[in-house]
Each structure stands twice: as C-alpha cells, then as structure tokens.
Amino acid sequence: MMMNLDELADYEIIIDEDILMSLFKRNGTIDLQDIQKMLDSHKLPKEIRNLLKKIMKMENNETRKLKPIALNNHAKMGLYKKGGVFHNALPLLLESTSIAMDKQERQVMFFNRMNLPNRKMIIVSASANKKLYQGYFPDRRIIFHTIHKAEYQGKVIQYSAHTMSRKCIEQIGADTVFDKIEKITGKIPVISFKMANKGDIYFGKTEGFDEYCGKDIAVVGTPHSKPLFYKLLACELGYIKKNVSYTLNCRRVVRNGYDFKIMSFADPDIQNLQLFLIETDLEKAIGRSRVLRKTCTVYVFSNYPCEQAELIQTEYLPEINDEEEMKCEEIGNA
C-alpha cells in the first residue's frame, strides 16, 4: 500500500490481509485547547475558521460526517508561515471524513477515509467481514467466497473466567495478574496491552513480527477500544441514526459458534463492528506463534471466546468488584 494509488490503476490487485484493519487505523485526535488557540490567533482562512467553530460547538459524544478540505503543500506552507500556533494535526483534521467529540478527554477524534483504486481486487483473509466491506465500499460490488478454515496444528487454551479488560487488570494490579498467569503458563512470552509493558509486541502492534514462531505464548487481555472510537467508525460507515443513544451494556451475543455475554451495543451493525475489532486483535496476537502450522500452545486470558479454543472457566484471579465481570460471566456453545 506504499505505492501511489494511481500507479495501481491498470492492475488487478491481490491483498493477502484484511485491508479494513489498516484502513480503520487512519484516525487521530487533536486537543480542544489547540483548536481554540488556532481560533484565537485569527490567522486561519475563513473556511477553516468556520469549520473549527462548528466543531467546537459539538455536544459530547456527538459524531458528524465532514466534507474534507484538501490542502496542497503550498497551502500547508502558507499556514505554517503564519506562526507557531498552527497545529501539525490540523491538515489531518481538515482532510478527515468523520469526527467525534470527546469532551471528557478534551479532544476531537477524526477519521480519514482512504478510497482504493476502482479496480478488481481480491482480498484473501480469514477475518474479512462482509457487512463491514459493504459499509466501507457501498458503491462497489462485493462477492464473498467462504472456504473451510484450516485446523490449528497447535493448541489454543483459553481461560475465560475474567474479563481481562484494562480496568480489570488495573484494579487487581498488573504485577498480581501476570504473576498468577505465569503460575499457569510458566515463563513464556506475553502479548497484552501496551500499558502492561511486556515487550515490543502488544495489541494494536502485532503485524510483521515472527520472533514467536513455534513458541508457546500467552495472550492476555480483551482489547476493547473506547466506545467513542466505535461510534466514530460507525459514523463513517453510515450506521449512526439521529436522536439515538448508543451505549455499552452487558448483552448476550451469538458469534462464531459461541453464545456469551459481553459489554456491547444494542445496534447490530455497531455491535458487529465492535466484535470484529476485538476478535481480530485477539486472532492477530494468537497468530504470532504460527499456531496454524506449528505444534505450539497459545494460552489466552480473555472473556471473548476465540475460535478453536479449549475453554476453561476456572477462576484464577483474586475476587474483585468488577461490575463488567459480575454482569458478563457466561460463555457457552451456540
């Protein structure tokens, strides 16, 4: 994807990955105080000032589609010359196609859509989600061919008694959590949240690493994103309806052959988006061991059931007052 997209116009394109995961990462944030500083400087063109004023008037958790304002290099240099008040993230904000207001964190989240060449494309992926591709490419003809998934040569053993969300780990204490896990798995590499400081590979940064190939590893955590991030992507995909409140609650879902409870949205489209992102992050982490073709063991500690996993619901952590865990504690076969 590093080539100029125009150079691909005459080619049939084959992508050996779920390209949506890369496209969904085209997001960022800008602090409200930085937007206000730019407005106070009175150095921005009228069109940009008017847009920033509208953004500052948004309600908390509000999402909005935008018509991008494309800036060429000459226009960007002109803004830079107007003084240091110009924020580096401004061009990305102006070129974004959807935004979300987060007044709790005092920032605006934005998403910048990338349109792929209007050519025949073949995407080969075990995680591709038809509904999401139809949402991202509404004007393209999408044809899905489902093939039987290969069985793992290795094993996935999943301990699902605890949510293992960031909040769960923080409440118990990371040292306590990982000490308890090490007693189960032995001393093996761990992939978890970045905050856990368990190495260079963590949720959101698992692609391109092969150092755990054939090794036993532990995958620790349920990689939820901020609810507002799901709403931002949902806005881009056209799922958001006016005057509807989209909130997380403990809900029973049926997915991938499992019937389980998890903190999720009532709207089926946004729920599908959320669960896709969670399970894809988990599966990518599991895949670092190459368990598909190597006789290794991956231990997963999460309440989100993974495909081909042997589920163990024995408790392994101290009792905590985890509201999510008290509500969402059941997993079964669908």
Spans of model-derived segments:
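ASCE RecA-like P-loop NTPase motor cores
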Residues: M1-A334
